[in-house]
């Protein structure tokens, strides 16, 4: 058991995670903790036995939780972690602040973080995964992050400590990112909002935004962002090699590779995590067999299968 006497947040045992992920699949976590604020999170992690695993979870936009669930304490940040403050060209956002909200508030203040507007998820996830699109990455604008380490200690990490790479960073194991400071370049608010609207229009025309998906399924083999630069003509894209392998529209159970954009894995209704991950693995095998390219997952998969 976990001692709850000193915490103010909500601790829920055996919490089903399927309703917390965009794909609406997954089994239960041993525990779900929703801290009230940073002090509460620090208190909880200090008293949590060291042998209990911690999994920080954002809004579940880039995540498959396997059907057997997660043997860990899942930490999900809420309202106490979604403030957005702008000072000059620097935007400091709580880890639970949505990327789209940060982009809009920055634009209101004449700060260009427009690439965040079409990225699903929260700032915590954007930093952890070095999220990006249209040739811009979180690492390009990142200045520092506040994290609560697994020990409960509050620390400030810079870009050197996080060692950003394509869709990766070195956030310490068990650490929970609580806020990040990003520095954009000045811009005209009206022009920034117009650019974001154009990006949204393009996304809606090319991606299955009305389906249950988790964004891009696989990293691009070239290491570029999944949508590429607006003027990028590089041929080696994940969607292209998936198409060449004949896997656009492929199905397994309730899972499907989108007909609209073949690098989007969607839950058409009633899919299990096993369906989704299984179809993804079929795609990886077929792409390797036809092109010799090994696709790497961009969607994070965690937890245990139902039978194990």
From Swiss-Prot:
Gene source species: Ruegeria pomeroyi (strain ATCC 700808 / DSM 15171 / DSS-3) (Silicibacter pomeroyi)
Taxon lineage: Bacteria, Pseudomonadati, Pseudomonadota, Alphaproteobacteria, Rhodobacterales
Main function: Cell wall formation.
GO cellular component: cytosol
Main location: cytoplasm
Keyword Lyase carried by entry: no
Compositional bias annotation for Polar residues: 214-228
Basic and acidic residues composition-biased segments: 200-213
Record protein name field: UDP-N-acetylenolpyruvoylglucosamine reductase
Cofactor: FAD
Domain of life of the native organism: Bacteria
InterPro entries on file: FAD-bd_PCMH (IPR016166), FAD-bd_PCMH-like_sf (IPR036318), FAD-bd_PCMH_sub1 (IPR016167), FAD-bd_PCMH_sub2 (IPR016169), MurB (IPR003170), MurB_C (IPR011601), MurB_C_sf (IPR036635), Oxid_FAD_bind_N (IPR006094)
Annotated metabolic or biological route of this protein: Cell wall biogenesis; peptidoglycan biosynthesis
Active site: 167, 216, 298
UniProt keyword terms in alphabetical order: Cell cycle, Cell division, Cell shape, Cell wall biogenesis/degradation, Cytoplasm, FAD, Flavoprotein, NADP, Oxidoreductase, Peptidoglycan synthesis
GO molecular function annotations of the record: FAD binding; UDP-N-acetylmuramate dehydrogenase activity
